[in-house]
């Protein structure tokens, strides 16, 4: 216990003065007497008194005086500094040369910053693309072609969608016979004139003459637009599956003279029915009017003459058909021979107008 008490010392005689500007400081400093005690080794964590006025003992030996330098000393210092600077510069140049020789074959990595060069007099200018003022003002065709191609693709896709999904309505709206035979000008558009041709045929020679005049008028209309009528009839009446039948065999009438004389009348009626066919109508026509147009059609597939049966098997007789048509005394155009009676036959087989434009084999 006594040893512990000797090691532990309490700060009793030390006074802490926090009033540095108090007037009593100077008086107290004068009265304080310095107690000189033997020096002991300093210990950490304890406060010790220090005398600021105590001067450390100067080491005996060479004394260094830091006074003003004489001019001779200054000149020596300057000469030595210049010599050191020249030596350092020479060493730096040697290091640079050695580094340049070592890194010569290596390619320096370009900096990420973009570098710009003036190419007015450079030979590399010939390799660059030339830009003139005209090309700046007018856009190049290559920049316009992708837009046109994309528009063409869009148009083709729309056309394919329209033809695949809405074929019957588009065929009715866009068929050229609608423009060639308007409903207001053609006399065969009204339902009254539609039902009259069979009555005229029964009236006698005067009715036949009137029918022949109508046939000539229909020829003038159809001959100018035979190609368009053929195209529309080709879309509206696809060929049925089976052996191909020549279309002229339908025109070949029976060998009786009465049928050969009555031939121009059904052709006129068929021309009228073809002019009425492509007109789009959302309201279906009554079924009572349809047999009237089918009466004026030459014999269909069920009642074909033996000549037409032989032609169906693959032995066409265009000479006999043309000869019998000429006996009637009227020249029938090729487009009317090929397509118009088939139009009447399809009308007699398919009565509702919606089924006319449906692609596929007919009944």
Swiss-Prot record:
Stretches with biased composition (Low complexity): 133-148, 197-210
Residue positions where Phosphothreonine is found in the record: 145
Keyword vocabulary terms for this entry: Cell cycle, Cell division, Coiled coil, Cytoplasm, Cytoskeleton, Mitosis, Phosphoprotein, Repeat
Coiled coil start-end: 70-94
Post-translational modification (record): Phosphorylated during mitosis.
Sequence repeats: 38-41, 68-71, 238-241, 243-246
Phosphoserine PTM sites in chain numbering: 22, 47, 65, 70, 98, 122, 140, 186, 190
Disordered: region residues: 39-67, 95-363
Region (4 X 4 AA repeats of P-X-X-P): 103-246
Biological process according to GO: cell division; microtubule bundle formation; mitotic metaphase chromosome alignment; negative regulation of cell growth; positive regulation of DNA-templated transcription; positive regulation of microtubule polymerization; regulation of mitotic spindle organization
Tissues expressing this chain: Widely expressed in adult and fetal tissues, with highest expression in the adult brain and fetal thymus. Not detected in adult skeletal muscle.
Compartmental location: Cytoplasm; Cytoplasm, Cytoskeleton, Spindle; Cytoplasm, Cytoskeleton, Spindle pole
Function: Required for normal progression through mitosis. Required for normal congress of chromosomes at the metaphase plate, and for normal rate of chromosomal segregation during anaphase. Plays a role in the regulation of mitotic spindle dynamics. Increases the rate of turnover of microtubules on metaphase spindles, and contributes to the generation of normal tension across sister kinetochores. Recruits KIF2A and ANKRD53 to the mitotic spindle and spindle poles. May participate in p53/TP53-regulated growth suppression.
Similarity remark: Belongs to the PSRC1 family.
Entry protein name: Proline/serine-rich coiled-coil protein 1
Organism: Homo sapiens (Human)
Classification of source organism: Eukaryota, Metazoa, Chordata, Craniata, Vertebrata
Gene: PSRC1
């Amino acid at each position: 216990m006594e040893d512990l008490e000797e090691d532990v010392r309490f700060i009793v005689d030390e006074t802490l003065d926090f009033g540095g500007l108090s007037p009593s400081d100077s008086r107290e400093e004068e009265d304080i007497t310095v107690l000189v005690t033997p020096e002991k080794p300093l210990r950490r964590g304890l406060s010790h008194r220090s005398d600021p006025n105590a001067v450390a003992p100067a080491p005996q030996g060479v004394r260094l005086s830091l006074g003003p330098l004489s001019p001779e000393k200054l000149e020596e210092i300057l000469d030595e500094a210049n010599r050191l600077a020249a030596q350092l510069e020479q060493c730096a140049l040697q290091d640079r040369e050695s580094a340049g020789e070592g890194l010569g074959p290596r390619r320096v990595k370009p900096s990420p910053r973009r570098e710009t060069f003036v190419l007015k007099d450079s030979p590399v200018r010939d390799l660059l693309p030339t830009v003139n003022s005209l090309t700046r003002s007018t856009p190049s065709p290559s920049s316009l072609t992708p837009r046109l191609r994309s528009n063409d693709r869009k148009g083709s896709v729309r056309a394919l969608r329209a033809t695949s999904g809405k074929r019957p309505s588009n065929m009715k709206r866009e068929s050229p016979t609608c423009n060639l035979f308007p409903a207001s000008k053609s006399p065969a558009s009204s339902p009254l004139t539609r039902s009259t041709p069979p009555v005229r045929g029964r009236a006698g020679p005067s009715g036949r003459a009137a029918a022949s005049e109508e046939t000539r008028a229909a020829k003038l209309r159809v001959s100018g637009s035979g190609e368009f009528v053929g195209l529309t009839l080709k879309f509206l009446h696809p060929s049925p599956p089976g052996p191909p039948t020549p279309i002229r065999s339908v025109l070949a009438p029976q060998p009786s003279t009465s049928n050969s004389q009555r031939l121009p009348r059904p052709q006129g009626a068929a021309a009228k029915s073809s002019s009425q066919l492509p007109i789009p109508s959302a309201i279906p026509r009554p079924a009572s009017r349809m047999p009237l147009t089918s009466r004026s059609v030459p014999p269909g597939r069920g009642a074909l003459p033996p000549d037409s049966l032989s032609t169906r098997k693959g032995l066409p007789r265009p000479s006999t058909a043309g000869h019998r048509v000429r006996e009637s005394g009227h020249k029938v155009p090729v487009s009317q021979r090929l397509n118009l009676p088939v139009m009447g036959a399809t009308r007699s087989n398919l009565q509702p107008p919606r089924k006319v434009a449906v692609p596929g084999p007919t009944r």
